[in-house]
């Protein structure tokens, strides 16, 4: 592009806990506004917004004191930051009814300036393979959220947009949904493309997780761009040795949301990725409690995993089987691969930890909030507001930060 700029601005729609946004901020982009309907996720973004402002103004100690405090008064933390920044995190569902008000808040924040980029993707449950079986897609309003996304494109006319979603969006209604989205976007004046292999995988961006996502990138027709080629990162890092080893071993139900010291020195992976980023303590290393029945199953699952097999729920001793419909629970219990990368972390982690069993048999538990956040490549000073369950849900729904940063760097080159 002909105009050289130092900073590019973006709006993050359906922002969740801010994983995508964090990656773009790391790549030098400036957020104008975040829009998210979940209150806990909004509070998380407000706290992260405070972190970035305090860091830029050399006042990180205020943020660190907040992390260390046992009472955590987030409103007090936010008071240290210009009010308009906190107000730029808009806690609203995006709908026909709320659009005028959302636009008004963003316009005030923009103060006549342009928006260079819109990022974000509507909640993925609607397009996910699982979600589809449950509901008649036509009547689910979430399937029409892309129309509101297009309204933001029409109003703010950014140079580019990045639309993130689950692989299920490709096959939803035999591809009809995707073509509807493409058509609407083209009518708004944009060229649009998906990756040559249909999706990108987080593990190619240095994330220790096998997570496929469809990243749709669009640009104004006159810009004459094409879908970028992403560099993939080859590495042999492993979950247990490189991602979890410095955290204190915990048993079922142990841990705290508050600050605790690291148990061991950092690792090369944690340094390279800036996950463990300079603090001498970590928060939210807390595990949910499970009953004895589940814990016995965890032990069996880990033994089988170590022998190269996955646990089949139906083959457990009868006394341990609590669900009559064993077919739908075949893969209910899954161990995180300690000697490789994790399987995909999803929001269901908030319901129970059975799908994310810690690979160390001695600890016999599901993974902690902080371990889940690390699998999603969130830095250790990223604090998730709300309850333990709320934190798990935010993490499961997020875009991994390292993946977001890799995408953001390419988008910046294109701009």
Label each region the model flagged.
Residues 2-5, 189, 381-385:
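Short, hydrophobic/aliphatic alpha-helical segments
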Residues 2-157, 167-171, 176:
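Core alpha/beta nucleotide-donor-binding catalytic domains of modification enzymes
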Residues 122-126, 220, 349, 379-380:
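Short, small-residue-rich loop/turn micro-motifs
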């Amino acid at each position: 592009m002909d105009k050289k700029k130092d900073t590019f601005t973006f709006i993050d729609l359906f922002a969740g806990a801010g994983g995508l946004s964090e990656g773009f901020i790391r790549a030098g982009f400036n957020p104008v506004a975040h829009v998210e309907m979940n209150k806990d996720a909004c509070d998380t973004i407000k706290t992260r917004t405070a972190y970035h402002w305090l860091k830029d103004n050399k006042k990180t100690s205020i943020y660190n004191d907040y992390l260390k405090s046992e009472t955590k008064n987030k409103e007090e933390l936010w008071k240290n930051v210009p009010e308009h920044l906190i107000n730029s995190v808009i806690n609203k569902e995006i709908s026909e009814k709320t659009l005028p008000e959302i636009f008004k808040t963003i316009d005030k924040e923009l103060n006549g300036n342009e928006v260079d980029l819109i990022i974000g993707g509507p909640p993925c449950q609607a397009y996910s393979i699982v979600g589809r079986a449950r509901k008649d897609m036509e009547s689910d309003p979430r399937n029409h959220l892309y129309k509101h996304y297009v309204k933001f494109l029409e109003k703010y006319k950014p140079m580019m947009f990045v639309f993130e979603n689950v692989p299920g969006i490709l096959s939803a209604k035999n591809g009809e949904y995707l073509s509807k989205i493409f058509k609407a976007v083209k009518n708004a004046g944009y060229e649009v493309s998906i990756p040559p292999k249909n999706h990108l995988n987080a593990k190619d961006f240095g994330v220790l997780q096998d997570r496929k996502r469809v990243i749709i990138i669009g640009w104004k027709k006159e810009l004459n761009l094409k879908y970028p080629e992403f560099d993939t990162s080859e590495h042999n890092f492993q979950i247990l040795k490189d991602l979890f080893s410095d955290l204190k071993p915990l048993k079922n139900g142990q841990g705290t949301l508050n600050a605790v010291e690291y148990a061991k020195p950092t690792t090369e992976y944690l340094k390279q990725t800036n996950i463990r980023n300079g603090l001498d303590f970590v928060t939210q290393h807390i595990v949910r409690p499970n009953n004895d029945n589940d814990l016995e199953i965890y032990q069996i699952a880990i033994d089988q995993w170590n022998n190269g097999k996955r646990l089949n729920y139906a083959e457990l001793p009868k006394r341990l089987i609590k669900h009559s419909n064993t077919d739908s629970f075949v893969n209910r219990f899954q161990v995180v691969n300690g000697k490789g990368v994790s399987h995909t972390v999803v929001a269901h982690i908030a319901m129970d930890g059975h799908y994310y069993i810690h690979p160390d048999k001695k600890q016999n538990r599901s993974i902690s909030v902080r371990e889940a956040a690390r699998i999603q490549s969130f830095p250790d000073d990223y604090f998730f507001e709300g309850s333990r369950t709320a934190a798990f849900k935010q993490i499961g729904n997020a875009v991994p930060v390292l993946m977001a940063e890799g995408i953001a760097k390419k988008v910046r080159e294109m701009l």
